[in-house]
Amino acid sequence: MKFAFFTLGCKVNLFETQALSQLAQARGHEIVDKDADAVIVNTCTVTSVSDHKNIRAFHKLRRDNPNAVIAACGCFAQTDPERVRATGEIDLICGTRDRAQVIDLCEQAVSGQAVQVHESEDSGFETLPAGIPHGRTRALLKIEDGCNNFCTYCIIPYARGRVRSLPVEQALGQTARLADAGVHEIVLTGIEIASYGKDFEPQVPLTELLEKLLTAQPNVQFRLGSLDPRAVDDVFCERLAGFANLARHFHLSLQSGCDTVLRRMNRHYTSEEFYRCVERLRRAFPDCSVTTDLIVGFPGETEDEFTQTLAFLERCAFASVHVFPYSVREGTKAAAMPGQLDQQTKTARAERAKQVAKTLSAAYRKQFVGRTLYALPEHPTGGLWAAHGRYGFPVYIEDKAEKNHPVTVKVIGLHKDGVLAKFEN
């Protein structure tokens, strides 16, 4: 059989799609880009815009694969299966539980068998194979799924369920296999990785897992996905600062720099508590890259509250800020809040925040000019080699490099969203 895969959304979805692709290949199936017998769409529902992207993807995939069995899994399929079904394009709907069954179901449907999709109970973490995807230099490893935080703007806890974690021994085994396969960098991802191990009895803190992984694979660089700032306590910093193979890039989810907005969002920290986490990281990991996400135009956000957020961005001196204008997500508390802002105001505030973020990013990267950095080349682009470094920003190398072979380069300037570098003579 020929399988095709299409992914929307986050790194967790990307990992899960890669895992399903590996499962299909292990059964002898061919992975193709077109003329597939079965197409698996991994959907996203983080915003209403995401839902529309899913539906457009369904229609396009059906046009491109008129005779294929098309299966939808993921968050949109989990939260709104009736809407998925109403498109008339999808043959199988599987949601976010028991992902591996979707391969079985596609095989049955293509062979003409009657298919019954069983709604799986939330029975724990579903372990899927980790592997380096074709054409990439880094591997993703999902260590956690689900979220217990219930921010007022977010539908994901309803799509993904409660926190579930990959057992430590399985994490060690998967990273060992990736290292043996020649992977130089592993990105640890999940829906809310700061909650890793809270479902275990006794609980296993994220810090403990990281210590074991970093110790077991000293020649592999580990990078963390998005972190709730509450994970960055003194223990986290004291126990991990000595590991050279932990990337000096920490993405802390902020969302707003104004305390009144944070309370409306049901974020469980204040701006001052967040700032102390940033300072803690910089003391433990000098020159580390601290990046963040920001939602502007949240319901009820005043000009003064927005101005407080801009000032807080500058105070934290983030290396990069992903700015999003608030998008109404039906089914969340925020969607019913008073004080919904018009799109023009939200767009204007997003542009102002992006300008601040652009200035901060350039200021952070300038400090590396003249310094020597580690880089992992990934692909050629525009006469340069694009590479990943330890600090979160891209490294563009002037000289010819070899993919997936770590190098040491000297930074000679800024380039696009990263730095320009060359081999030292």
PLM feature spans:
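Short flexible coil/turn linkers enriched for glycine and charged/polar residues
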Residues: H134-T137, C147-N149, L246, S256, ...
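Residue-level signal for inorganic ion chemistry
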Residues: I40, C75, V102, L188, ...
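Short acidic, glycine/proline-rich loop/turn micro-motifs
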Residues: L262-M265, K333-M337
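Terminal RNA-binding accessory module
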Residues: A336-N425
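Active-site proximal loops enriched in glycine and acidic residues that flank catalytic Cys/His/Asp
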Residues: G190, S226, L254-S256, T292-V296, ...
